[in-house]
Each structure stands twice: as structure tokens, then as C-alpha cells.
Amino acid sequence: MAVPNRVEAKQMRDHPHRIHEFRLANLVTDPFAISSLSLALIAWIIAFAGSVVAASNSKKYPAFSWWGIVYQILLMVLVLILYCYDLIDYYKSFLSGALAVAFVYTTNSAAEMLYQDGSRMGAASAGVILLSMINIIWMFYFGSDNASPSNRWIDSYSLRGIRHSVLESSIAMSSRPPLVSRNVSKYSASPQMDLYNATPAPHSQGFYPDTHSQHYVSSTALNGFENAGPPTAPALHGNMGHGNNTSTFVTDTTNGNTETTMGDTLGLYSDAGDELTSFPYVAKALYTYTADSNDAYEVSFEQGEMLRVGDIEGRWWKAKRANGETGIIPSNYVELVGENSI
């Protein structure tokens, strides 16, 4: 993935939901994708050309191999499209099953043609054998999680970096103790009081926490902070002298960014909570990055610097430097090296 400029970075924070567009750069920047697809195309051409010649000169050519060859090219086109739209991670389970079917087709065709006489049949069998080898490599890659050692090693050569692992993030989220507010409703007048009155729940059942931790700040929480105004007190309704409830209520549909101040947001980053919970991962800076002077939320770092990071689901990660400075960093400038290792 190309390094975003300032305008693109701001757009990413304003619109955190990914927009999948057709880009050949998504394919050509991934050496594994471009090399495996190229080899698969060469093998398919050999198998198809050999099959055409063999079928025209021999009645012993297995007829079911034609569907296997057509199925293989359709699958290759699908892989190409998914890579170009950057949707490969969403369809890995489907691809694993589809490749298993293709592997059965190509191996059966190879078994039928390998022992037939003639160079034409031999060329066709060589093509389907190569396709079988590529299919089993794809099954191993697409069937493994992105956090597996083999996939991390393969993705380390990609210009886009190591792909996000849903399994690894789920495990990290499940290890965070959820916060349950004491004597404060979700319509509390003061959101800050919810944070200070919250205590970790003694037991959390299920794979995900029952409630989101207040220490976890997603990339969507940064929307609108670039032009944040000075802190303003919430408007009070009614007469202060009366005993009526004069609190400002916030409903579930409130964005929360309209009255969130820059100081409150940075306070979430510098919260005195458990560091290992807020920043469970360790990342190494691949390049030197200088924060934008107009963006109070970006943090600078040097090449080779070790950073603690959290919220690794987006393009911008929450990070903490060794000197205690916290902020957000571009994910394509760093590489995950472990969890709680420094």
C-alpha cells in the first residue's frame, strides 16, 4: 500500500469504513499474489494447449478434465478480482473450499493422463500437475490465519505489510477486562464520570467482552477532532435552584464527537490504566515518521524504534512511545513484532 499523504490520511480518519475499489496496485505490490497467479496462468496455458492437441489426436483423453480446466481458470479470475479489490481476507474460507475442489479435479486429471502414451498427453499432464502444486500452496496460505508464522513470513515481503489478523485481535479483545459503571446510567449527565466510576467486571463470559473497555479507543473515535474547538460546558436546562434534574442527556444515537474536546480525547490516551491492556502489542518502526504539526493526534518516531500499539484494526493505530508520548501512527510505517515483549 502506498504511503498516504496528509490529505488522504485525514480522509481515512474522517471515513474509517474501508471503500474497496479496483486497483491493480493491490495485486502488483504483493509478490506472493503476482508470482503465484503468474505461475498458475502459465500452468493453465500448458494444460489447456496440451489438452486441445491431445483430445484432437486421441480418444483416451479424459472428458471430465475439460470441466476441471474451465473451473481452474474461473477460480484464478476470482482470485485476481479479490486481490484487486482488496477483499481477499473476507473470502479466505470460500477460497480454501473452492481450491480443495480444484485440487481434486487437477489430481484426478493428472492420474488419468500421466500414464498415457504420447508427448501431447504428457504436456497436458505436466500442466495439471503444476496446477495441483499451486492449488495446494494456495490452500495452505488461504486456509491459514494471517497471524500464522507462514503467512507472516510470506506477507513480510509485501509492500502492504503484514495483513490484519481477526483471530489475534479477538484474543486481545477477550483478554481486556470490561468496565461496568457503578450507579451511573447510560444516560449519565457526565461521560467523564462514567469513566471514573467504572470498575472491571469480575467475570466475563463468552469470547468477546460484554462491554467495550473505556481504555480502548477505535479509529472511529477520532472523527472530527481536527477542527475541535475549545472545551465548553454542557448546556443546563431548567432552573438550577430547583431540585429537578438539570443534566444534559446523551442518547445512544449521539455521535459524541460534537462536544468531545481535544483535551478529553488525549486524556483517554494518557489514562493511568493498565498499559498492557491499552497497548497489548509491540511494533517496530520500519521508517522514520514526522507527525503533522497541524494534527495534535499524530506522534513522531524514529526508524527502528520500539512502540507499544493498540487498536490495530484500522490504517491508523493507537501507539505509545518509550518516553510516554501517545497518539496515532500510520500502520504501514511499522511492523508488529510481538505482544507484551518489552
Swiss-Prot record:
Source organism, top-level taxon: Eukaryota
TM stretches of this protein: 32-52, 63-83, 94-114, 122-142
Extracellular compartment segments: 53-62, 115-121
Membrane topology: Multi-pass membrane protein
Cited function: Plasma membrane osmosensor that activates the high osmolarity glycerol (HOG) MAPK signaling pathway in response to high osmolarity.
Official protein name in the record: High osmolarity signaling protein SHO1
Keyword presence, Transferase: no
Cellular component terms (Gene Ontology): plasma membrane
Subcellular localization(s) per the UniProt record: Cell membrane
InterPro entries, sorted: SH3-like_dom_sf, SH3_domain, Sho1_SH3
One of the protein's GO biological processes: regulation of actin filament polymerization
SUPFAM superfamilies: SH3-domain
Signal peptide location: none
Domain annotation SH3: ranges: 278-339
Annotated PANTHER family: FCH AND DOUBLE SH3 DOMAINS PROTEIN, HIGH OSMOLARITY SIGNALING PROTEIN SHO1
Keyword annotations of the record: Cell membrane, Membrane, SH3 domain, Stress response, Transmembrane, Transmembrane helix
Predominant place of localization: membrane
Gene of this entry: SHO1
Cytoplasmic side, ranges: 1-31, 84-93, 143-342
Oligomeric form and interacting partners: Forms homooligomers.
